[in-house]
């Protein structure tokens, strides 16, 4: 523990918090272009083919992003919007693609939690 004299000489340094989504550069969302769209397998207890995309962002970063929902229309050179949020069972995936914006279509025939998947209100 420092003495009072040491604290007078040099004040305490405040610890900087590390961001969980550095590629966004403090923005809520970022635009990017898909460089590769593929499937990936999750970590140990789970088993599936998760849909992911490699995206080159306007901030210069190239990141891996998860495509949520059932079915998608993304391919190479698709322009997408990215938000933060990791996928727990996919190592290295720290971003989500926002459905229903830019080139990404919303999920078809979605009735519940529509706003999360960019689905329009079903016509009666």
From Swiss-Prot:
It holds the Pfam family Ribosom_S12_S23. GO terms for molecular function: rRNA binding; structural constituent of ribosome; tRNA binding. It comes from the Bacteria. CDD domains: Ribosomal_S12. Transmembrane segments: none annotated. InterPro entries: NA-bd_OB-fold, Ribosomal_uS12, Ribosomal_uS12_bac. The keyword Coiled coil does not apply. GO terms for biological process: translation. GO terms for cellular component: small ribosomal subunit. Keywords: Methylation, Ribonucleoprotein, Ribosomal protein, RNA-binding, rRNA-binding, tRNA-binding. Residues 103-124 are annotated as: Disordered. The modification 3-methylthioaspartic acid is found at residue 89. Part of the 30S ribosomal subunit. Contacts proteins S8 and S17. May interact with IF1 in the 30S initiation complex. NCBIfam families: rpsL_bact. With S4 and S5 plays an important role in translational accuracy. Belongs to the universal ribosomal protein uS12 family. HAMAP family: Ribosomal_uS12_B. This is Small ribosomal subunit protein uS12. It comes from Prochlorococcus marinus (strain NATL1A).
């Amino acid at each position: 523990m420092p003495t009072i004299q040491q604290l007078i000489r040099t004040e305490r340094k405040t610890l900087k918090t590390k961001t969980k989504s550095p590629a966004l550069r403090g923005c809520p969302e970022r635009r990017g272009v898909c460089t590769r769209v593929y499937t990936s397998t999750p970590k140990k207890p789970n088993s599936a083919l998760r849909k992911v995309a490699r995206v080159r962002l306007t901030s210069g970063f190239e990141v891996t992003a998860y495509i949520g929902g059932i079915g998608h229309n993304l391919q190479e050179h698709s322009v997408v919007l990215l938000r933060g949020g990791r996928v727990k069972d996919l190592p290295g995936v720290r971003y989500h693609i926002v459905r229903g914006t830019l080139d990404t279509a919303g999920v078809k025939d979605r009735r519940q939690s529509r706003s999360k998947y960019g689905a329009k209100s079903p016509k009666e």
